[in-house]
From Swiss-Prot:
Regulatory subunit of serine/threonine-protein phosphatase 4 (PP4). May regulate the activity of PPP4C at centrosomal microtubule organizing centers. Its interaction with the SMN complex leads to enhance the temporal localization of snRNPs, suggesting a role of PPP4C in maturation of spliceosomal snRNPs. The PPP4C-PPP4R2-PPP4R3A PP4 complex specifically dephosphorylates H2AX phosphorylated on 'Ser-140' (gamma-H2AX) generated during DNA replication and required for DNA double strand break repair. Mediates RPA2 dephosphorylation by recruiting PPP4C to RPA2 in a DNA damage-dependent manner. Serine/threonine-protein phosphatase 4 (PP4) occurs in different assemblies of the catalytic and one or more regulatory subunits. Component of the PP4 complexes PPP4C-PPP4R2, PPP4C-PPP4R2-PPP4R3A and PPP4C-PPP4R2-PPP4R3B. The PPP4C-PPP4R2 complex appears to be a tetramer composed of 2 molecules of PPP4C and 2 molecules of PPP4R2. Interacts with DDX20/GEMIN3 and GEMIN4. Interacts with RPA2; this DNA damage-dependent interaction recruits PPP4C leading to RPA2 dephosphorylation. One of its GO terms (biological process) is regulation of double-strand break repair via homologous recombination. Residues 53-78 are annotated as: Disordered. It comes from the Eukaryota. Keywords: Cytoplasm, Cytoskeleton, mRNA processing, mRNA splicing, Nucleus. Belongs to the PPP4R2 family. GO terms for molecular function: protein phosphatase regulator activity. Disulfide bonds: none annotated. It is found in: Cytoplasm, Cytoskeleton, Microtubule organizing center, Centrosome; Nucleus. This is Serine/threonine-protein phosphatase 4 regulatory subunit 2. It comes from Oryctolagus cuniculus. Residues 69-78 have a biased composition (Basic and acidic residues).
């Protein structure tokens, strides 16, 4: 990635913005949560806990085509 940025700077003469410029001081109002604890997020629906992105979470094999969904949900005007 660094090589690509350097190549871009050579070709265009423009300097790409470094990600470190976006990183500000940590917000004291936000509690830090380690990444390992974020791996297994649980959501409670109707009193039942569902893992969101933990192991054993079913993954969709393919996303339904948006156009097909529109055709299924289309109600003809009467």
């Amino acid at each position: 990635l660094q090589e690509a940025l350097k190549d871009f700077e050579k070709r265009t003469g423009e300097t790409m913005i470094q990600w470190s410029q976006f990183k500000g001081p940590p917000n004291p109002n936000v509690e830090y949560i380690p990444f390992d604890e974020m791996k297994n997020v649980m959501v409670v629906m109707n009193g039942v806990m569902f893992p969101i992105n933990g192991p054993g979470t079913p993954r969709p094999l393919n996303r339904p085509n948006l156009q097909q969904n529109e055709e299924k949900n289309h109600h003809p005007d009467e």
